[in-house]
Amino acid sequence: MLKIFQKAKNQFIRTSIVLFLILSFLILLYTFYISEINFQGSKHEKYIKYYILSLFLILFFLTSLRFSKKFQEYLVIITFSTIISLYTFEFYYFLKFDYRVTTVKYKKIVKESKIKIYEDFKKMNIQSIPYYRVEKEFLHNNQVIFPVSGVSKIKTIYCNENNKQINYMSDRYGFRNEDKEWDNKKIDVVLIGDSFAQGACVDNKNTLSANMKKKSDLSIINLGISGHGPLKELVVLREYAEFIKPKKIFWFFYEGNDLTKDLEAELSSDFLKKYFHPDFKQDLIKKQKNIDNLLLKDFRKKMLFENQTNDSITKLNNNHVSKFKDFLENTKYLRLWAVRNILKKNISKKKIDPEFKKILKLAKNEVNSWGGKLYFVYLPEKTRYQNTFYREVYSDQFKKKKKILDIAHSLNLQVIDVDDDIFYEIKNPTDLYYLHFNESGYKIISNHLSGYIKNEY
């Protein structure tokens, strides 16, 4: 009887180690899928630790099969105890916060292909161009040009977040303004930022700049461009805002991706880094005709590529991606999401790139040089309010908010924290968002900003 028990025990221990080995291999495969397929290798730095961990576990459990029975027994006990402890901790946080944010909670949005809309406009003899992010410099007549605006005076096919396609007519420099705004002898206020400043995804009358105009009789120019991070925003300031020298500039910082995806990509461009020299300038405001030609030519190349894509395959892939994202959200607890985030919060020493402070300092100095004032507007992402885990556990450390605001304060910038100053008093801030802000979100923020225009704060 004792021999049978011992044999069963040994078999259980060996089977457990093999199971741990298989799980380690699955972690490696999952890491490869997320890093190399889902993110196409763009986030190696983030996932390298999971590669190392999974490879270590595979080698360790594989080697342990040759260890003594006693060692294997202790290994199984310790491993199971660790797993049970971690998942007990994880389920506590899961039950407390229910940190899932799945796309099935959103109203399903049917988006027409921007190319299809472009083709429809073409049939009506309306010149248009789908909005797309400019991520590279162009060579024109042996001169390098890096545009930071769009094509001028053209119907721009922009975005759709609430089953309503948003298009706008760009101004003489490719921004989202009525062109006549540039004819004013004096421009009082300029907005600089990404898609939130640009007005995604609402009609012209509901953007930040439009709402702010309703509250004052001042001239306001919107220089927001989707996809811009801090360095490109510095370029916009120097190339366009400096030309009009407004009294006030509202610099919009979006916590969702300004310091990660956007700034990291911008700092990889040797050309854009030339703007760290205060005197460097392309004089883009004088080159709009060239910019138009370059962007239209580049778009035609992109359009040829998209037309060669099988539409049914694209829809299938989009559906697959949506379902996969829902699956990831619904299985966060299996991947110890809360445990990993708490460890990251307490262990991670990753600092804010010092170039960010340099950019803000350069921006402030340039605005001060013509007697203007720079306002730093901190915009919170929707996830901050969807997931109470972030508020309870991370607090002001979420997205390094406190450190970012400390940098702005250290430069004596006027800081407007939309999270604390506005949304804190609102019961359900998520009601103010589609993916970007909705009409109500833009309105409540612009009402607050209008107070700074009138010097009420």
Please provide the spans of the model-predicted regions.
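N-terminal membrane topogenic signal
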Residues: 4-20
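Serine-dependent acyl-ester chemistry module
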Residues: 19-44, 254-405, 413, 418-426
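Internal/C-terminal transmembrane anchor helices
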Residues: 69-94
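Membrane/wall-proximal cationic-aromatic binding patches
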Residues: 98-214, 340, 421-432
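Alpha-helical transmembrane segments of polytopic membrane proteins
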Residues: 43-57
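Histidine-centered active-site loop/cap adjacent to the catalytic His
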Residues: 433-457
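Conserved SGNH/GDSL esterase-like catalytic core that processes O-acyl groups on lipids
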Residues: 198-279
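Alpha-helical transmembrane segments
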Residues: 27-31, 57-68
